[in-house]
Structure formats: structure tokens, C-alpha cells
Amino acid sequence: MMKSFLLVVNIVALTLPFLAAEVQNQEQPACCGNDERLFEQKKVLYLLSYPVLNNYLRTAPSYYQNRASVPINNPYLCHLYYVPSFVLWAQGQIPKGPVSTDIHQSTMQYHQAKHPSFMAILSKKILGKATILSTDAIAAPEQTPVSAAQPTVSAGDTPEVSSQFIDTPDTSVLAEEARESPEDTPEISEFINAPDTAVPSEEPRESAEDTPEISSEFIFSPETSTGPAIASMA
């Protein structure tokens, strides 16, 4: 009795899937059109939106890299930070900034990645040329411009003035020479003994009548007279 019951249960379990498939195939032609329309509408709305957005972003003028804003206060999100590789950089080009302190930050942060063009590496030849140009620019002397309004006087333009200034003797020296040698320079002796060219003095001048001896001595001085004239006067 139990054996026959188990056989019937196994047969029914094997035949139930096939019976269910046949029932679905019989009910499908009745609502096939509506299901296909709904499926196509969902497919179009879901699949065409992504290419349209991509095409719009590619054709639109974008001046920065589009990055979605990520909340900082959410502890369950894994933030991706872009770390530049300093392996190819020189030792002087590695940025060494101060350690950031714990300060207040906004709740939204925009993660931006550097474009590869910003990480261009200069060759050694270009760096050498740049340093040479900088040293030449520093070592070049600055020439002061000479204005045309200021005339430049050379020593060769005025030879007469310098010679006259050097050759002009002192009048006191000429007077002493005339007193020592009156025969050689008669004009200078006359200029010295002339009454009109005498230097005026503050004291009152005595006339020749009041002082005959002084006037005779002044006129017939032994420096300007000969020997016979002195003998006759005596």
C-alpha cells in the first residue's frame, strides 16, 4: 500500500512542470501583445537615457572634469583619493606642504583628478638652458642713457682759455721785477710811478709843496735815476 502511494507521488511530481508549461503556452496568445509593448517601453526608457546623456556631455563644452559630489560625513562610503606618483619627478619638484590641521570643512567635497598634461617633466637640456638664460639676464650691466640736452665739453675744445689762465703772471711779481730791473721794463716802472694810478688811502694825502724833500726823494730815487743826476741834486 505504501509502495503504490510513493509511486503515484513521484509520477505527479515529474509531470507537474510539464503541465504548468503547457498551461502557460495556452494563456500566452491572449495577452502577448500587451506584454511586448510594456517590455519595449521599459527597455527604451532605460537604455536610451544613458547614451543620450553621454552624447550630450561629449558635445557640450566642458571646462573642468565632471565629478559627482560626495558627502564627507557618511562613514560607510569609501573615498577614493588620487595620489600622484613621484617616482618620475626630480627631487626639487616634489611638493612638500604643511600638515593640514583639524579645521571645519564643508559637508560636500568635489574630488578632482589632475590631468596628465599638468605632470609634464622637463628634460635636463631644457633645464640647463633656462638656468643659463637667467644668469645672463642677471649679469648683464645696465647702461645709463646719456641725455642729448647736456653738452659734453672736451679738453681739446678750449686750449686757449687754459693756456691764458696758466700764463697770466701776478701783478705783485711784475712790480718787484720792475723795481729790480727798470731798464728792461720801462713801461711797468712808469705804471708804478704814475700819480694817477696810485691806490687811494683813507689818510689825507700831503701835497708836494708841504713836503718837498719826500717828493724829491720819490721822483729821484736811486733805483730810477743815474749817478750824475744824484750828484747835481746834492
From Swiss-Prot:
Region (Disordered): 143-234
Disulfide bonds: none
Signal peptide stretch: 1-21
Modified residues (Phosphoserine): S162
GO-annotated biological processes: lactation; protein stabilization
Official protein name in the record: Kappa-casein
Site (Cleavage): F118, M119
Keywords: Glycoprotein, Milk protein, Phosphoprotein, Repeat, Secreted, Signal
Tissue: Mammary gland specific. Secreted in milk.
Positions of Sequence repeats: 127-153, 154-179, 180-207
Primary subcellular site in the record, as a coarse category: secreted
Pfam families, alphabetized: Casein_kappa
One GO cellular component, as annotated: extracellular space
